[in-house]
Regions:
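N-terminal cationic and glycine-rich segments that engage phosphates or anionic surfaces
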Residues: 1-104, 109-447
Length: 447
């Protein structure tokens, strides 16, 4: 405990880190305040039906990603997911279309162009999604519109406000990334999820304690133990690495000898972090956006199954998408050929493997071997809420038994802590984590 207190004091001593944390807290507070502002023209007291609708099914998950803004007809109701959807499309285009491939190879200028295209596409998606949300709002809470306002008159300004709200959230996320601590977009999603956790916890506790059959306390304690075990497993998954030994040749410069030491390349078991989960979840929201233009009761069995995140069809497709996006995102994040060239340029080699092409193939083989079990495990954890629901765990609490919510929480928290850790170690302070090193198969590798 004393070490933790000393570390927190050290964080406060570092002016740059202190300012980054305060800026992050400020922007997060602005985001949470915005989720409470209801669209102009909506009577808040008439939103009960919408909140009942978002209490179950896929809408409850979408409401959690928006921090409760979706069910409260907030100006931030559409959240950050339209931007995530646009990012998916642009990353696919960067792999499949030569024009965008060339742009991606242009370095910083190319990334700025792709970022601009992503924003334009986000606006286009918002111009589709905002009316979709408003049509659903009319179907659910038509009487909640303030008297004297017609829906046709309400639609245009409401669409603009919803689109502007989402773009403002994106701006907040980018400012957090640039001037704050952590990945801004992921942090905003995580804050929305955390906002739902206390209510879900107390609902489940109240349900178990009120059970007429008795044994509610025991069942609730078992649930907490299982939840703790799943959290630990998720942390191991996110932190796990496979280290490839690298030997550097000795160089004599003047009277001094350099190199000759053995180091490691730490390949993470789940190199893609939380992005495949967020991307897969964004795609699973598409049927919901489409069906909002019509009465959900008139949708086909297939569409209704995709809207129920506890159905077998939804979970099978969701798991497949996570596995596919894990491979895709790992492939665009790690470049074995570039790693092999950098190693060769610095007189490094993997023992028993020829430098150059053979080294690139070896790294690619190792990545394929560790990505498969990692993606399967992450997909299993992602669909665990469906199994929790079968055991009579309340749906809102079941979403934290693995699932997208827990994986995002674990991934974002660890990523943010590691960024704080790097600031502390750079200034020769002890870090928040137990060590400034990565542990995994093959020994210890320095950052």
């Amino acid at each position: 405990m004393k070490k933790l207190i000393d570390t927190l004091k050290n964080i406060w001593k570092i002016e740059d880190l202190r300012q980054r944390i305060l800026i992050t807290v400020l922007f997060v507070a602005i985001y949470r305040f915005g989720t409470k502002i209801v669209l102009p023209g909506i009577d808040y007291n008439g939103l009960d039906k919408l909140q009942d609708q978002t209490a179950t099914g896929l809408m409850s998950l979408l409401d959690m990603f928006s921090g409760g803004a979706f069910s409260h007809a907030s100006i931030f109701a559409l959240g950050i997911m339209p931007y995530i959807s646009a990012s998916i499309v642009m990353q696919l285009l960067a792999v499949a279309v030569p024009y965008f491939q060339k742009m991606q190879r242009e370095g910083e200028s190319g990334r700025k162009k792709i970022s601009a295209y992503t924003r334009y596409l986000t606006v286009a998606i918002l111009l589709f999604q905002a009316p979709s949300y408003l049509f659903n709002l009319k179907f659910q809470v038509g009487p909640a519109l303030a008297s004297g306002i017609d829906w046709p008159v309400f639609m245009v300004p409401a669409t603009i406000i919803l689109a502007a709200g989402s773009m403002f959230i994106l701006w907040l996320g980018e400012r957090i990334t640039d001037k704050g601590i952590g990945n801004g977009v992921s942090l905003i999603i995580m804050i929305g999820i955390i906002a739902r956790l206390p209510n879900a916890f107390f609902q489940e506790a109240g349900s178990r304690f009120a059970a007429a059959t008795g044994g509610g306390l025991v069942m609730f304690l078992i649930e907490i133990i299982i939840l703790y075990a799943v959290v630990c497993a998720s942390i191991v998954l996110v932190q796990g690495v496979r280290k490839i030994p690298v030997q550097y040749a000795k160089r004599v410069v003047g009277n001094k000898t350099y190199g000759g030491a053995r180091q490691y390349i730490p390949l993470k078991l789940f190199a893609a972090n939380v992005m495949p989960i967020i991307f897969a979840q964004a795609l699973m929201f598409i049927p919901l956006a489409i069906v909002q233009y019509a009465n959900p009761q008139e949708a086909s069995w297939f569409t209704r199954s995709l809207m129920d995140h506890q159905s077998w069809l939804y979970n099978v497709i969701f798991a497949i998408l996570i596995i596919a996006f894990t491979y895709f995102y790992t492939a665009i994040t790690l470049n074995p050929t570039q790693m092999a060239e950098d190693m060769k340029r610095n007189n490094g080699f993997i023992p028993g493997v020829k430098p150059g092409k053979d080294t690139a193939e070896y790294i690619d083989t190792v990545m394929s071997r560790i990505t498969l079990p990692g993606s399967l495990f992450i997909a299993f954890i992602a669909i665990m809420p469906a199994f929790a629901g079968l055991l009579d765990v309340k749906q809102e609490f079941a979403q934290f038994f693995g699932g997208t919510s827990l994986l995002i929480l674990v991934g974002v928290v660890l990523d943010t802590l590691q960024q704080i850790e790097s600031h502390l170690l750079m200034r020769h302070y002890d870090g928040l984590l137990s060590s400034g090193r990565i542990h995994g198969r093959g020994g210890v590798a320095a950052y």
